[in-house]
Regions:
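Active-site neighborhoods of enzyme catalytic cores
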Residues: 54
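M16/insulysin-pitrilysin zinc metalloprotease superfamily fold
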Residues: 13-47
Length: 175
């Protein structure tokens, strides 16, 4: 499973804690995501379809429509105000494979990745396997200085309303 937010993409694998072989396979998957993704034309086009379908699905859901309306209100005057994590569908539909590869090379770097393991597992086994498998991820040739984006604190009184025929109740929130 995975998700993308404004500042990160997180991949999650749920595996049994007591099976070393499965642990190794899971770490190999993480390794491949980190440095060995293949960008075959057909796969890039397929992934575009997945993103477009996720976007369509969000547009058809009440929570998705609400998020599209409310998030820009909360993120007013920030870089995120008009940039949903899923991206601009015109860009997604028309992006070239080369631009996708450039993005991957820029942002998928070991120095800005973390592996977090949670569960009842031997830390010595886990640490050894992480070092053995993920230790082979090559260091970046070009270092990346991570940008920082702030969301200004809104000190004015403001309101946001969201009306949708699917809403069965009236909800009032104060933030």
């Amino acid at each position: 499973n995975a998700y993308t937010s404004f500042e990160e993409t997180v991949y999650m694998l749920e595996i049994p804690a007591d099976n070393k072989e499965i642990l190794q396979k899971a770490l190999l998957i993480l390794h491949d995501w980190a440095c060995a993704v293949s960008f075959e034309d057909e796969e890039v086009e397929k992934e575009k379809g997945v993103i477009l379908e996720e976007w369509r699905s969000r547009q058809q859901s009440l929570s998705g429509r609400q998020m599209e309306k409310v998030l820009p209100f909360f993120l007013k005057d920030s870089r995120f105000e008009h940039r949903m994590p899923i991206g601009d569908m015109d860009v997604i539909q028309n992006i070239s494979k080369e631009r996708v590869v450039d993005f991957y090379k820029k942002w998928y770097k070991p120095e800005i990745m973390s592996v977090i393991a949670i569960g009842d597992i031997s830390t010595s086994v886990l640490e050894t396997e992480i070092k053995n498998i993920l230790g082979t991820v090559p260091a970046s040739e070009e270092k990346l200085e991570l940008p920082t984006y702030s969301v200004p604190f809104n000190q004015t009184k403001d309101t946001c309303s969201f009306v949708d025929p699917e809403f069965q109740n009236t909800i009032l929130n104060v933030y």
